Amino acid sequence: MAKGRTTRTKQKKRVAVDHGVVHIKSTYNNTIISLTDPTGHVLSWASGGTTGFEGTRKGTPYAAQLAADKVAKDAVKMGIKRVDVIVKGPGAGRETAIRTLQAAGLEIDNIRDATPIPFNGCRPPKRRRV
């Protein structure tokens, strides 16, 4: 008779850094927030989709707020107190995510906007007609 397999959930490690980097990628359809150590290894992440939203609601400021709150709680749990914020993209969740990180008790050292700007790169999609 086969024995039942037991599954073990992965425990989050407490990282020995007190400073982290929060990357916020905010598009019109979603907001993805990643917490990394200064070398770039991802410690925690969340998005509008992982917080339970589907479709166009993933791109709302409220979805970004919930995602930022989850990442901030993980950061505090790991012992991270100070963060740098790098923001990419034109979406609606940029400001809300930064405010939520501050409200959760993280000290923001600096905010950098790293939105990629093309030097006349790809041709944009044709204009939408409704």
Curated annotation (Swiss-Prot):
Q: Show the InterPro entries listed in the entry.
A: Ribosomal_uS11, Ribosomal_uS11_bac-type, Ribosomal_uS11_CS, Ribosomal_uS11_sf
**What's the name of the protein?**
Small ribosomal subunit protein uS11
Q: Which PANTHER family match?
A: 40S RIBOSOMAL PROTEIN S14/30S RIBOSOMAL PROTEIN S11 (PTHR11759)
Complexes and interactors = Part of the 30S ribosomal subunit. Interacts with proteins S7 and S18. Binds to IF-3.
Q: Which GO terms describe its cellular component?
A: ribonucleoprotein complex; ribosome
Recall the GO molecular function terms of this protein's record: rRNA binding; structural constituent of ribosome
Entry's family note:
Belongs to the universal ribosomal protein uS11 family.
Keyword Transmembrane helix listed = no
Species annotation: Fervidobacterium nodosum (strain ATCC 35602 / DSM 5306 / Rt17-B1)
Question: Which Pfam family, any one, appears in the UniProt record?
Answer: Ribosomal_S11
Using the record for this protein, list the coiled-coil segments as residue ranges, or answer none: none
The Gene Ontology biological process annotation of the record reads:
translation
Q: Give the UniProt keywords, A-Z.
A: Ribonucleoprotein, Ribosomal protein, RNA-binding, rRNA-binding
